[in-house]
Every structure is written in structure tokens, then in C-alpha cells.
Regions:
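Short acidic alpha-helix initiation/capping motifs at coil-to-helix transition points
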Residues: 41-46, 76-80, 126-134
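N-terminal hydrophobic signal/anchor transmembrane helix of membrane proteins
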Residues: 66-85, 99, 150-167
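Acidic/histidine-rich alpha-helical segments that form the ligand environment
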Residues: 113-154
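Membrane-interacting alpha-helical segments
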Residues: 25, 64-66, 108-118, 172-180
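Mobile cap/lid helix-loop segments that border enzyme active or cofactor-binding sites
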Residues: 1-61, 85, 89, 184-189
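Preference for long, well-ordered alpha-helical segments
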Residues: 146-187
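Helix-adjacent hinge/juxtasegments
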Residues: 76-111
Length: 189
């Protein structure tokens, strides 16, 4: 059971309904977390910001979703690890490719650009110091524009920070996530 309750239907206004409907349409963020976040003005602002970062911008949505899933599994968020964007699926992000993202960054199915983004996501998740390096940004510049680097960094920051909050809400436990998707149990994070 979540540690913060879902908003009751009777409390939903037009804005809250629209944010939940958007989540139902896109698949990420999952409507369950949105039903908690829309309880507050700050939560609603985050949902709007997240939708802008995840679905807007210059980077392909599929690439951003791959980074989001990799970070989510690394911090063992049952909720975030099982959520899948319908948009990314339509762009070719299959569960087979997710398996490659989680287990084999050397996979020929991943482009050099995708590997660079996923490696940056790993460094971002590891803490403050690993990304605070000229060498990291030089590697990123080989594949991304300055604008894309900012976008990728914002995605990773949102995924790491808000992901920790969402994990703590206990919408779905890691154990429940592993029951839904047994492949998660193989992750050694």
C-alpha cells in the first residue's frame, strides 16, 4: 500500500484529470504516481515538467526511456522499473531491447550514441563526483549537442531524484516488481 494515498475521485479538478489522462495515454509516468502527485501544486508542477523533459526536446524519446529504465532498475524502484512508455514501445523499445540495455551495453543492437547516454546515466546514478569531469563531457560531445547534453542531464536528474521519492512511496515493492517481471530479479544492483 502506498505511503501517501491516491487522490480521491471527488477531489479531482480539470487539471488533475488532464494530467492523469495524459499518463494513461502515454504510459509514463504511470497514472498511479500521478494520482499521488496531483494532490499538491508542487506535484502537479513536477508532472508537467517531467512530461516536458520525457516527451519534449531534441533527444529521441526511446533513448530517454532507455536511460530512465536503466537508472530505475539500478536503484531498485519496483514502480519505475515496471513502467513502460507506450510512446517508446511505438518507437521500437521492446522488452528484448530493454534486456540489452540492462545487461549488455556492448550489444550491437545499441548505437554508440545510445551507449554514451546509458554510460552517462550510470555515472549520474553513481553520485556527484563521477559526472563532475571534463572527460565525461568530452565523451558526451562526441555524440550530443550542448542542448542535448542539458536535456540528458535533466532527464537523469529527474529520474534519480524523483525516482528516490517514488520508490519510497511504496506504490509497488521491488519484490512485487520481480513477480511482474521476473527478469528484474537477475539485476545485481
Amino acid at each position: 500500500m502506498p505511503r501517501v494515498q491516491f487522490i480521491d475521485e471527488s477531489e479531482l479538478g480539470p487539471e488533475e484529470r488532464a494530467l492523469i489522462a495524459s499518463a494513461e495515454q502515454t504510459g509514463a509516468p504511470d497514472p498511479r504516481v500521478v494520482r499521488i502527485m496531483v494532490r499538491s501544486a508542487a506535484g502537479k508542477a513536477w508532472v508537467r515538467c517531467w512530461n516536458s523533459v520525457l516527451y519534449g526536446g531534441l533527444l529521441p524519446h526511446k533513448l530517454k526511456e532507455m536511460c530512465r529504465i536503466r537508472i530505475s532498475v539500478a536503484h531498485r524502484c519496483g514502480y519505475c522499473s515496471t513502467v513502460r512508455s507506450h510512446v517508446a514501445r511505438a518507437e521500437g523499445l521492446s522488452e528484448d531491447l530493454v534486456h540489452e540495455v540492462l545487461n549488455d551495453l556492448a550489444s550491437p543492437r545499441l548505437s554508440a550514441r545510445e551507449r554514451a547516454a546509458l554510460e552517462y546515466a550510470d555515472l549520474f546514478k553513481a553520485g556527484d563526483d563521477p559526472i563532475d569531469s571534463d572527460a565525461v563531457y568530452e565523451r558526451l560531445r562526441a555524440h550530443f549537442s550542448e542542448e542535448e547534453i542539458i536535456e540528458l542531464g535533466m532527464l537523469c536528474a529527474q529520474t534519480v531524484g524523483v525516482g528516490r521519492l517514488v520508490r519510497s512511496l511504496n506504490i509497488i515493492s521491488w519484490e512485487e516488481a520481480c513477480e511482474l517481471n521476473p527478469a528484474l530479479a537477475d539485476q545485481e544492483h
